[in-house]
Amino acid sequence: MECGVATPAQLAAARAADGLSRAAPSAMGVDADAIVAFLDEVEAAGLELHSMMLWRNGQVVAEAWRWPYRPDRPRILHSVAKSFTACAIGLALADGLFRLDDKAVSFFPDFLAGPVDGWLADMTIEDLLTMRVGHASETSGAVWRALETSWVAEFFKIPIAQKPGTVFMYTSAASYILSAILSRVTGETLHDYLKPRLFEPLGIEGEAWDIGPDGINPGGNGLCAKTADLLKLGILHVQDGIWQGKRLLPEGWVAKATAPHGEPVKYGYHWWTRPDGSFSAIGRFVQMATSFPMYGATLAVTGAIRGSRHLF
């Protein structure tokens, strides 16, 4: 993605455009020295952090940008897209377009001529959200992008090795089928569905989402947006789906989406969860928004780091 050096005027313009308020760390009870120490440790460890924004109690209290990355330039967020997809599913459920226990196969009769495997027939929307689809192996975004045939058709060819709803296996195939289901019931792409319901109310502009061979957004990846947009996703969930006094996500949805489903992996509805109550949207190379409801805080970072464990 094309990048350039940001001038002070460009930085000021980007801050004004994102609609987020700023305050000194101390005003929000945040230790500025600890932030500097964190950034110093990242640098000393040789970790390539591209940007960082920290928000607490209504204010951005710290932000950092590594040359040549800029706050006004969208970047590929990789699997963070999954958490945006979860928002769309929550909205569609509230709209009565489908239910969590609806079977995935029921939306694609044209792809399933003949008998359907029993376990495949049992797979639900909730199984897709929690990545418990029973697939024998994971399917990454890179695998999807190499296919020029229908990704929906390919999904139904993946062998089912476990009963859906029982075993976690991280797979972008689940996210793609959620996007495909949404398109089937709305006649819109996932991106178009979210635009007036989420992106515009959050002040997210200039975002782009890839389209697969079926004319469907991948759901699990392919979304480009700014670091501030990533931060807003986390803030929205810290605030229980409310933005500037208006409810954007259905009441109760955030609690369901960020609660762990199953063991040993504590995964929600396309959100990674932790025992302390925090939760994260995470993309490859640490594109990440981690929300800490107990502190009223969200941290958004982007970078080229292999594994979030290197940061926390």
Give, region by region, the residue ranges found by the protein language model.
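Active-site SXXK
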Residues: G58, R75-D101, L128, L178-L182, ...
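Active-site helix/loop module of the DD-peptidase/beta-lactamase fold
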Residues: I76, D95-V133, K157, T186-A225
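Active-site Gly/Thr loop motif
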Residues: G206, E251-L299
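Extracytoplasmic/periplasmic proteins that interact with beta-lactams or build/remodel peptidoglycan
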Residues: M1-G29
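Active-site-proximal alpha-helical segments within enzyme catalytic domains
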Residues: A174-I181, N221-I242, Q287-A304
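A small/polar active-site loop signature that marks catalytic segments
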Residues: V133-I211
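Short active-site loop at a secondary-structure junction
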Residues: A44-M53, R66-D110, D117-M123, K163-Y170
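A short, well-structured edge-of-sheet supersecondary motif
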Residues: L39-Y69, A289-T290, G296-A300
